[in-house]
């Protein structure tokens, strides 16, 4: 490569924003599941980020992280997609893309659709056969939200 030529081995926009979503997920205190989201406008500007966790003012140390039982994390935890949508302090999210490390559940799909986000780019769909994700895909499809699966390669995950 000559000094006057640009580098050819740089990452794509999708890899970049999914990497940011993955990094956001690393902020989650959930011992079992860490999910991150990054919302981007059509000009590739980051609008908002989020990760799964408890609402503001709800202590990570006082509320349970248990997955089962009468008192479990599902009563308290906010998913990364909803956190990213609620964290946005600008105007409209109309036409935006959300990058998320795990395919959105049905509740997050509703928020994605209502916010005007037009594309979901996801890295993992491990719950694809669950009623929640089946409903999510049905709603997103009906609303015309584009779905794109992107797998980030291990060297990219490690920053190499």
Residues of each region from the PLM?
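Zinc-dependent deaminase catalytic domain
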Residues: 1-153, 157
């Amino acid at each position: 490569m000559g000094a006057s030529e640009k580098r050819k081995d740089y990452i794509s926009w999708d890899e970049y924003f999914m990497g940011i979503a993955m990094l956001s997920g690393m902020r989650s205190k959930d011992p079992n599941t860490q999910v991150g989201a990054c919302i981007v406008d059509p000009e590739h500007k980051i609008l908002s980020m989020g990760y799964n966790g408890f609402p503001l003012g709800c202590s990570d140390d006082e509320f349970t992280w248990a997955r089962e039982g009468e008192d479990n994390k599902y009563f308290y935890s906010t998913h990364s997609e909803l956190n990213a949508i609620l964290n946005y302090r600008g105007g409209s999210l109309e036409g935006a893309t959300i990058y998320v490390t795990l395919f959105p559940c049905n509740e997050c799909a509703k928020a994605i659709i209502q916010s005007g986000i037009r594309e979901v780019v996801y890295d993992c769909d491990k719950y694809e056969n669950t009623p929640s994700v089946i409903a999510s895909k049905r709603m997103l499809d009906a609303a015309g939200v584009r779905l794109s699966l992107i797998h980030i390669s291990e060297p990219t995950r490690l920053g190499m």
